[in-house]
A protein has these predicted regions:
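N-terminal helix-forming leader/targeting segments
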Residues: 1-57
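Short, charge-rich patches within N-terminal targeting peptides
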Residues: 63-73
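Short, positively charged and aromatic/hydrophobic N-terminal segments
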Residues: 77, 89, 93, 97-104
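N-terminal Rossmann-like NAD(P)+-binding domain of SDR-like oxidoreductases, especially those catalyzing
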Residues: 103-278
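A short acidic, helix-capping loop that chelates divalent metal ions and anchors anionic groups
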Residues: 186-190, 281-286, 320-322
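Short-chain dehydrogenase/reductase
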Residues: 197, 245-253, 289-297, 327-328
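C-terminal substrate-binding subdomain of Rossmann-fold SDR/epimerase-dehydratase oxidoreductases
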Residues: 298-430
């Protein structure tokens, strides 16, 4: 049984309704609206007793087709419904199918920078699954062309050329921009700070100017918990002092301040998410960095026979087992937060994390459990600047955005990462 809620009745067709001349199609608890095959809906309801919700407003699709009597419009509408049904079937068979999704929207045009990277690629996939149109803008300096969902439009960018990004934004005509593109290696930022201020701040400013010029309504920014620096208390709330201790965190904080001014002076509504440790994967997209600094993919290199051992940096921290504690958030949960942030009226700064911390040793032990293999670890000295414990309070996002992580357990996060890495042991081909 994939779900946890029991159902006493079959409700295949009650989700479909005519709203303002269009159709709202609802996939509810495995059932499909009456535009889809009722037998298939019955099959889903019987086989997958789960709480699975996704709402789609197709009125704009129908209008683009030319109205009720337009034959081409009707074909487009029927194809759209068939696509929704196929997506429902795919999710039911997916190991991620226990996620309860509630996405209600008019479809939007979304411009995603850094959509060839780890977080951007998964967010692009989730946006497309939810019915949005996506343009991905990426210079591929860190990302991978094959990590871009084939359903998205791809623009090879040169963010340092103001005219390029302005033209791309004008052509896409987005209602929302999701800005993931950035340099994000703390250590590198300490040796090459100019690279970080140039890309994360100056190129970000170019994007902001393009957004204002194109009259974009919403800007969602990928910030970081590194803007806080060493926290005064844990769990960390959004009102903590921001005292970054490296150019990476400083560059993100500078852009946060720019967003506040652009909202005040230009009316650009924004949400900035301060991520903790993104991890996990979907069936199609996972984590592949050319320089891998993240713990979970590095640990998984051992059972993949790509390394003999993993490393533990510091075993004398004031934590129960002496190793650093971090907060891990599943990449799908992170993507869902971004879609919630796109709603009108949502704005401000939000932490994104599970609210539970796991030590380095606990992560290694969990990877051993999931892979069924022993993972040797070499103990090394602390790395400069590593705080003992970083754990988020995401209560503000829960209260104000209606967000709630669906993968709070480390085992589930590691399991999805392991499945992806087994299928893609060398990552993306490009």
């Amino acid at each position: 049984m994939l779900g946890t809620e029991e159902r006493d009745e079959f409700d295949a067709g009650s989700g479909a309704e005519d709203i303002d001349g269009g159709f709202k199609v609802v996939i509810h608890s495995g059932g499909i609206c009456d535009q889809a095959d009722a037998l298939a809906a019955k099959f889903l309801e019987m086989m997958f007793d789960q709480n699975f919700v996704a709402e789609f407003d197709l009125s704009s699709e129908k209008k683009r087709g030319g109205g009720d009597q337009d034959q081409e419009g009707q074909k487009l509408h029927e194809a759209r419904v068939a696509g929704l049904f196929c997506n429902a079937m795919k999710r039911c068979f997916s190991p991620l199918s226990d996620v309860r999704r509630v996405v209600t929207f008019p479809p939007m045009n979304v411009f995603v920078t850094g959509g060839a990277g780890y977080i951007g690629s998964v967010c692009t996939e989730q946006l497309l699954d939810a019915g949005h149109s996506v343009t991905v803008y990426d210079n591929l300096s860190e990302g991978h062309r094959s990590a871009v969902d084939k359903r998205a439009k791809f623009v090879l960018g040169r963010p340092e050329h103001e005219g390029d990004i302005a033209a791309a934004v004008q052509e896409a005509k987005p209602e929302a921009i999701l800005h993931f593109a950035a340099n994000a290696l703390v250590g590198e930022s300490m040796t090459n700070p100019g690279k970080y201020f140039r890309n994360n701040v100056c190129n970000g400013l170019t994007l902001l100017e393009a957004a204002v010029g194109a009259k974009v309504k919403k800007f969602v920014f990928s910030s970081t918990c590194a803007t806080y620096g060493p926290p005064d208390r844990v769990p960390m709330t959004e009102d903590l002092p921001q005292r970054p201790i490296n150019p990476y965190g400083e560059s993100k904080l500078m852009f946060e301040k720019m967003l506040k001014w652009y909202e005040e002076l230009h009316g650009l509504e924004f949400v900035a998410f301060r991520y903790f440790n993104a991890a996990g994967a979907t069936e199609e997209f996972g984590e592949h960095h050319r320089i891998e600094t993240h713990l979970i993919p590095n640990v998984l290199k051992v059972p993949l026979k790509q390394k003999d051992h993993c490393e533990i940096y510091g075993t004398d921290y004031p934590t129960p087992d002496g190793t650093c504690i971090r907060d891990y958030i599943h990449i799908v949960d992170l993507a869902q937060a971004h879609m919630l942030a796109m709603a009108p009226g949502k704005k401000g700064f939000y932490n994104l994390g599970n609210g539970d911390g796991y030590s380095v040793r606990q992560v290694i032990q969990t990877c051993e459990k999931i892979t069924g293999q022993k993972i040797p670890a070499e103990e090394k000295a602390r790395r400069p600047g590593d705080p003992p414990k970083l754990v988020a309070s995401a209560q503000k996002a829960i209260n104000e955005l209606g967000w709630k992580p669906k993968f709070p357990k480390l085992e589930d996060i590691v399991s999805t990462a392991w499945e992806w890495h087994k299928k893609h042991p060398n990552g993306y081909p490009d």
